[in-house]
């Protein structure tokens, strides 16, 4: 078995318990203290240099690739320059979590406590909090805007220019920066910051060279006591690491090592997530083709190296605060690999490497990387068939994004046509042009639509906290028509959207000022040309997509109110509001709840009554969010604007915890609907009706992604004819209905329930949570229950 060694490597990594690692935090503190008088770009560069030159490194016995993020595989480094607050508060709680458990030694606790005084009121969390205007304090205090993750971490959502990295090496970027620095006129005030930015690039490039050279020495040292076969391999690793990533790659092995070094180091520099591989099959294929033709590689050896790379990918880890885990359950890093789609000149982009990536991802059967296939009307039929075969393995991959809607949407927002054809997935379902896209394309305020509706109904006051969130537009109990509610919704949603923009802008400015990411900026066009890091507006394109939660709950709630209260008169506004306040308890509570659930139209059934109501309500958000530029607007990038997106990841569970009962019959504290998917078991007319309902959303304006989860029983796809039905369904959804995205959990309810009772029997069970997959056993009970509760469709 040519993959036997990689299978052992996989098992070793999966068996490793994830620990909190203080090493990076200690080294970062040392650098920040030593260079505290330096401009921030230089301080950040020296920090990365300190870490890369002194951190623990190792090469696993089974690995053909060198490079590690932490002191041991799957350990989570700490980033005190972003935050240390939640870490200190949860030091004794990491091992006691319901999900996303981390282990920690007493020595690590003491190391973290020892550096705490340096970071008190001296990191992103503190500075961002201080910058927030008083007008938005009520939303932060109550957790209405889900900014916990944003204030604790960077948020990448991009793919750097790996094609140029392989073509020119880091020395190509270094030389361009050197030329740009030499051309500066230092009498121009703007040149001073550029001068220091270019110097910071020289520092980080040198640091990466040193990091790679350390692996050269380590590989040679390990070779001295290795078996003859392993010695040969270690010496090859040493030779490769002596060349890349500083020099251009000339073989597939060099290309993989170069990409991995950068992918890993970017996640040492910043604790942002969704740092993605981009269009892997496009920029890697020339090296694969050349090596296959020369005999240097075989298809088997290429797949083995790919499986090695994907296992290395799962070694990257990130610890989040307990509050943040509610919206990012399963410790996901969202590292996306995109294959398929079309070339920049509009031809089918599927190539032999596309198939090998599919094969290798199936072989490793891991939740990372997140595999996305770009669908288009001319997609190779055999490739589509292979995608479904991999999907049938039941680990939630690949997901499909649709060129037929995404490319025109990008062009409508100002993206050049050839760049639009070159997009990739960069996290869950979000998309961007790799190597040209700004640092924060995803807003993180999580607009909770059902809660906005409750605030609207309660005259602008949040029922959960009792605090005023919006101006007074009237209480639902006093409304005489559905039009009154719609008018109040319009005004309340627009007000809260403006508030979310204030919060996001404040935190964006803090990110820009406090934690510039030098290596990431250097590898993204056109930061070097502009002399600006990403957060200053260095990228060619820069957009932010707001995220919305509970779309189906909003639809079903509006439909119930309009039909049962204002059209049929079966409920008075006072009766409905009382039922919501009491969580459907009391004299008529259960009766009213049953009425709301069973007697009103539901989103997900191709029912225009419910579908048109949510479209109308959603259009208000689309219109309002587009009015507000981001902090990079007018500073260089094309765009600088906002648009909507439904990639709510697992925030539907966390946001549901703080949302009281809603008029769709949902109980207080229970999960909201995720993405644009229907509420659990409300979609009663099969998958085609679901797809038709989703297609009625303003998909062309939801450029940030329209996330649709579906679940089917494995027996549904057991026969060849069933697979052909699914392919026909997907083609209809994408070609005729212009769907944006779809992904499947191919797993039975019975399997999931058994995994809850007997987790030891299902260690390898992987499920699609939202726009990403995770091991079922590491999820919290609430998230597991949410996945189990999803509608199971047949074809």
Spans of model-derived segments:
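Short amphipathic alpha-helical segments enriched in leucine
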Residues: 213, 217-220, 559, 792
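Heptad-repeat amphipathic alpha-helical coiled-coil interaction surface used
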Residues: 181, 209, 216, 220-223, ...
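Conserved catalytic cores of very large enzyme subunits
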Residues: 4-198, 229-236, 244-795
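Extended non-globular scaffold/tether segments
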Residues: 199-211
């Amino acid at each position: 078995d040519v993959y036997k060694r990689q299978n052992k490597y996989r098992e070793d990594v999966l068996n490793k318990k994830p620990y909190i690692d203080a090493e990076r935090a200690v080294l970062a503190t040392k650098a920040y203290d030593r260079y505290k008088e330096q401009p921030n770009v230089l301080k950040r560069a020296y920090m990365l240099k300190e870490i890369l030159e002194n951190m623990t490194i190792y090469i696993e016995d089974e690995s053909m690739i060198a490079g590690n993020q932490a002191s041991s595989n799957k350990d989570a480094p700490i980033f005190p320059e972003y935050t240390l607050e939640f870490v200190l508060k949860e030091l004794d709680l990491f091992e006691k979590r319901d999900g996303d458990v981390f282990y920690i030694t007493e020595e690590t606790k003491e190391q973290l406590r020892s550096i705490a005084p340096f970071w008190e009121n001296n990191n992103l969390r503190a500075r961002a909090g201080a910058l927030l205007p008083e007008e938005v304090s009520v939303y932060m205090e109550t957790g209405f805007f889900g900014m916990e993750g944003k204030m604790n971490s960077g948020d990448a959502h991009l793919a750097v220019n790996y094609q140029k990295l392989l073509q020119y090496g880091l020395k190509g970027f270094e030389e361009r920066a050197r030329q740009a620095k030499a051309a500066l006129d230092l009498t121009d005030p703007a040149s001073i910051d550029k001068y220091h930015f270019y110097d910071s690039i020289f520092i980080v490039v040198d640091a990466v060279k040193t990091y790679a050279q350390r692996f050269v020495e380590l590989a040679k040292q390990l070779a001295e006591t290795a078996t003859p076969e392993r010695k040969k391999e270690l010496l090859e690793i040493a030779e490769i690491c002596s060349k890349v990533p500083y020099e251009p790659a000339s073989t597939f092995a060099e290309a993989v090592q170069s990409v991995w070094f950068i992918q890993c180091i970017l996640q040492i520099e910043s604790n942002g997530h969704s740092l993605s591989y981009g269009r892997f099959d496009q920029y890697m294929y020339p090296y694969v083709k050349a090596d296959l033709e020369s005999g240097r590689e075989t298809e088997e050896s290429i797949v083995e190296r790919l499986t090695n790379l994907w296992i290395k990918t799962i070694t990257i880890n990130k610890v989040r605060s307990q509050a943040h885990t509610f919206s990012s359950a399963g410790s996901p890093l969202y590292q996306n690999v995109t294959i398929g789609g079309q070339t920049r000149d509009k031809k089918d982009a599927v190539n032999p490497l596309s198939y090998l990536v599919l094969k290798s991802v199936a072989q490793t059967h891991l939740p990372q990387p997140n595999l996305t296939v770009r669908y288009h009307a001319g997609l190779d039929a055999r490739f589509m068939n292979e995608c479904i075969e991999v999907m049938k393995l039941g680990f939630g991959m690949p997901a499909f994004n649709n060129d037929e809607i995404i490319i025109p949407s990008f062009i409508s927002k100002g993206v050049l046509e050839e760049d639009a054809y070159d997009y990739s997935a960069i996290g869950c379902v979000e998309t961007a042009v790799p190597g040209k896209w700004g640092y924060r394309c995803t807003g993180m305020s999580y607009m909770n639509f059902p809660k906005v509706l409750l605030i609207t109904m309660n005259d602008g006051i949040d029922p959960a906290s009792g605090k005023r969130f919006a101006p007074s537009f009237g209480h639902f109990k006093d409304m005489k028509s559905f039009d009154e509610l719609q008018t109040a919704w319009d005004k309340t949603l627009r007000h809260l959207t403006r508030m979310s923009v204030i919060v996001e802008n404040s935190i964006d400015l803090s990110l820009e000022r406090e934690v510039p990411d030098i290596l990431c900026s250097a590898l993204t066009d056109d930061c070097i040309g502009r002399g600006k890091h990403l957060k200053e507006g260095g990228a060619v394109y820069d957009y932010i997509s707001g995220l919305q939660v509970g779309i189906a709950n909003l639809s079903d709630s509006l439909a119930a109110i309009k039909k049962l209260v204002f059209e049929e008169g079966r409920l008075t506004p006072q009766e409905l509001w009382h039922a919501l306040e009491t969580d459907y308890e009391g004299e008529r509570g259960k009766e009213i709840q049953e009425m709301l659930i069973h007697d009103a139209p539901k989103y997900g059934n191709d029912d225009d009554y419910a579908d048109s109501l949510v479209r109308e309500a959603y259009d208000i958000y689309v219109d309002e969010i587009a009015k507000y530029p981001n902090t990079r607007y007018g500073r260089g990038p094309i765009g600088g604007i906002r648009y909507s997106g439904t990639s709510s990841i697992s925030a539907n569970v966390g946001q549901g915890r703080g949302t009281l009962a809603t008029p769709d019959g949902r109980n207080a504290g229970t999960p909201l609907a995720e993405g644009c998917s229907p509420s659990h078991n409300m979609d009663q007319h099969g998958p085609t009706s679901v797809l038709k309902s989703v297609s009625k959303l303003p998909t062309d304006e939801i450029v940030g992604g329209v996330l649709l989860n579906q679940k089917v029983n494995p027996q549904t796809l057991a026969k060849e004819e069933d697979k052909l039905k699914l392919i026909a369904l997907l083609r209809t959804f994408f070609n005729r209905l212009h769907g944006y995205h779809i992904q499947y959990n191919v797993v039975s309810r019975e399997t999931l329930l058994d995994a809850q009772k007997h987790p030891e029997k299902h260690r390898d069970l992987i499920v699609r949570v939202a726009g990403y997959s995770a091991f079922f056993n590491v999820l919290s009970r609430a998230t597991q229950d949410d996945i189990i509760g999803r509608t199971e469709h047949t074809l």
